[in-house]
């Protein structure tokens, strides 16, 4: 079984990754040397633990965003996704079919003046069985 990593190791590794992301990689030995250069770590054992966790996190970061670590590259990617504007607006269609509840919500959001709204009755998509014993 693996060992439990302390709060100190995890916090130190996260800070090192946020500040020195470009100098780190997936290799433990290079990460160990980088940790030795940039931080004052009191013992060899602690340095190795931090470098090991840095390596572990770097592998996870390559697969996707990691909670608790904010890297400039990931922040820019998230901004791009959040600010995405589609080529054709959903409101530019000829007829937009909505149910009565959606029509009411659009009125409350001051979109009630849209001329291409067509109110349709919602179709019940699920077949609910009668309860047993009835």
Curated annotation (Swiss-Prot):
Pfam families: Ribosomal_S17e. The keyword Nucleus does not apply. InterPro entries: Ribosomal_eS17 (IPR001210), Ribosomal_eS17_CS (IPR018273), Ribosomal_eS17_sf (IPR036401). GO terms for molecular function: structural constituent of ribosome. SUPFAM superfamilies: Rps17e-like. Its main location: cytoplasm. One of its GO terms (cellular component) is cytosolic ribosome. PROSITE patterns: RIBOSOMAL_S17E. GO terms for biological process: translation. HAMAP family: Ribosomal_eS17. Component of the small ribosomal subunit. Belongs to the eukaryotic ribosomal protein eS17 family. This is Small ribosomal subunit protein eS17. It comes from Ictalurus punctatus (Channel catfish). The lineage of its organism: Eukaryota, Metazoa, Chordata, Craniata, Vertebrata.
């Amino acid at each position: 079984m693996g060992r439990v990593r302390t709060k100190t190791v995890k916090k130190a590794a996260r800070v090192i990754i946020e500040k020195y992301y470009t100098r780190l990689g997936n290799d433990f030995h290079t990460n160990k040397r980088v940790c030795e250069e940039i931080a004052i770590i009191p013992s060899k054992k602690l340095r190795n633990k931090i470098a090991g966790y840095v390596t572990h996190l770097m592998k996870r970061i390559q697969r996707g965003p990691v909670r608790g670590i904010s890297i400039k590259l990931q922040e820019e990617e998230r901004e791009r996704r959040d600010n995405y504007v589609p080529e054709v607006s959903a409101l530019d269609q000829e007829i937009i079919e909505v149910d009565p509840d959606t029509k009411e919500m659009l009125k409350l959001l001051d979109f009630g003046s849209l001329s291409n709204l067509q109110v349709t009755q919602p179709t019940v998509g699920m077949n609910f069985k009668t309860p047993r014993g009835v």
